[in-house]
Regions:
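Formylglycine-dependent sulfatase
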Residues: 2-441, 449-470, 474-477, 481-484, ...
Length: 506
């Protein structure tokens, strides 16, 4: 089904396709022009990495809701974030742009300048009822960027309140302030479609120690990632991570039940994904797959054939243009993301679009745990066969200065690796996660899927490395990345708002 056939089948006319953020009065009231448009339920976990879902093959974690969405929709095996860090990753999702284009928004604990258009605002102008609960864009502050609410829209207490057609008494107006924490009393206009962001705080640390084991998980069943040492302490930590993944999955299941009760389940495009990889050494805040590859499943039975597994590369920055196109709007000209509506509606599995053969990722400042508050800038290109990483400041410590290695979240696994760093089974893994790195890294995924053996200096890979480096720099220059234009130090000069920030905006 091509785009024209799709919109004709779904009753979205040509006039709707021409919308660029403007809506008629009838649309704002939820008039006839909106009746054919789907709802959008976007569910994002905090630090959920591929392949930690039962449908992806994990033998311990149980994710029946994600499995259902994937079985009844499309499971994407190669979905990647723009950055393996909360704030820039979520900014890229909302704007449909690479995070390096977002100025301050390219860093953790920052602000997202108001000049960057976000898809919820466009949908709201087109008549959609929008909002979020819990963690949306962030952590960071709205006001320094010129915003009066979170970029994801007004905050609601929960999904039930959001769906109500009348205002809720005794609630705070708007979502303004640091992190947009005020509770909205905005009522859903009758007949209006909605776009809702459910942002769980799971499975972000801290965890309750042994919560996974106490729930019945067995540490001997855990498949320990090759980048981590195999110990009971690490295995127990992973089980605790699994327990929070399961809690996220359960809560999304409750949202689906609510939609079914209201008769809106099958006219809602449902997305389940994560904002970056798991919070363990050499995972989150790194450009290896455990930091950037996230689960992604999309269900929309009205238009998307289910039971499919797609191998195409998808960037989560592709979501914004996809949402806009699904709703009959054109993506804005500054979006670098590319709609994958054609992949969703193709009915195909495997490799669908030959052009989706690679993805780009990057990283700027995560924590401020280096002298001078600087980051560890990286960019990468990931193809089916290779991962190439360019480290722009190899003299810096990628995990943060050794006083605390602050770019790695505190955890029992981190503690174990630091305390046992000189032992034979830990020493090399510690150096890979905590030590300095060369300017270039290259991993042959056909031989090294765990990305532990850097072959960048081997002569037999010289041509492949040169080709990948050229493709990476071409994309960075085409999208005006300051790092590729000799202006990358600007990221280290932007304010860091993490120190003393309120806990509820994390």
């Amino acid at each position: 089904m091509n785009r024209r056939e799709f919109f004709r089948a779904f009753g979205i006319g040509a006039a709707s396709l021409g919308l660029s953020g403007c809506a008629s009065a009838s649309e704002r009231r939820g008039g006839n022009a909106l009746k054919g448009r789907p709802n959008i339920l976007f569910c994002i976990a905090d630090d959920w990495s591929w392949p930690y879902a039962s449908i992806a093959g994990d033998k311990v974690v149980k994710t029946p809701t994600f499995d259902r969405v994937a079985r009844e929709g499309v499971l994407f095996e190669h979905a990647f974030v723009s950055a393996p860090s909360c704030t820039p990753s979520r900014g890229a999702i909302l704007t449909g742009q690479w995070h390096w284009r977002l100025e301050e928004g390219g860093n953790l604990w920052s602000t997202l300048p108001a000049k960057f258009t976000v898809y919820p605002d466009l949908l709201e102008k087109a008549g959609y009822h929008i909002g979020f609960t819990r963690k949306a864009w962030g952590p960071g502050y709205d006001e320094p960027g010129g915003r009066t609410r979170n970029p994801a829209g007004p905050r609601f207490k929960d999904f039930a309140q959001f769906l109500q057609a009348r205002p809720v008494r005794n609630s705070l107006v708007g979502g303004a302030g640091r992190g947009g924490r005020g509770i909205s009393n905005g009522a859903r206009p009758e007949g209006a479609p909605f776009c809702f962001w459910f942002g769980s705080n799971d499975p972000h640390r801290p965890y309750k120690w042994q919560s996974g084991v106490q729930s019945g998980m067995k540490i001997e069943d855990v498949a320990v990632p090759a980048c981590l040492p195999d110990s009971d302490q690490v295995r127990t930590d992973i089980c605790d991570y699994y327990w929070e993944v399961q809690r996220f999955d359960t809560e999304v299941g409750e949202l689906l039940n609510t939609l079914k009760e209201k008769g809106e389940l099958d006219n809602t495009l449902i997305v389940m994904t994560g904002d970056n990889g798991l919070p363990f050494p050499r995972c989150k805040s790194n450009l290896y797959d455990r930091g950037t590859n996230v689960p992604l499943a999309v269900r929309w039975p009205a238009q998307v054939k289910g039971g499919r597994v797609v191998e195409d590369f998808i960037s989560l920055s592709d979501l914004a243009p996809t949402f806009l196109e699904v709703c009959g709007l054109k993506p804005t000209g500054d979006m670098t993301g590319r709609s994958f509506l054609d992949v969703l509606t193709s009915g195909k599995s495997g490799r669908v679009d030959p052009k989706r053969d690679k993805v780009f990722t990057g990283m700027e400042r995560h924590s401020d745990r280096r002298a001078g508050g600087v980051g560890y800038p990286m960019r990468a290109i990931r193809t089916r066969d290779y991962l190439y990483i360019r480290n722009f400041k190899p003299d810096r410590w990628p995990a943060g200065d050794p006083e605390g290695y602050g770019d790695i979240d505190g955890s029992p696994s981190k503690t174990y690796m630091m305390e046992h760093r000189d032992e034979p089974g830990v020493k090399r893994l510690f150096e890979l996660a905590f030590g300095k790195r060369p300017a270039e890294e290259l991993y042959d995924l056909r031989k090294d899927p765990d990305q532990l053996n850097n072959v960048a200096d081997r002569s037999e890979y010289a041509k492949s490395k040169e080709k990948l480096a050229a493709a990476l720099m071409a994309e960075l220059k085409a999208t005006k990345d300051p790092r590729a234009l000799g202006k990358g130090d600007i990221f280290d000069k932007y304010p860091y708002y993490g120190a003393g920030a309120p806990k509820e905006s994390r």
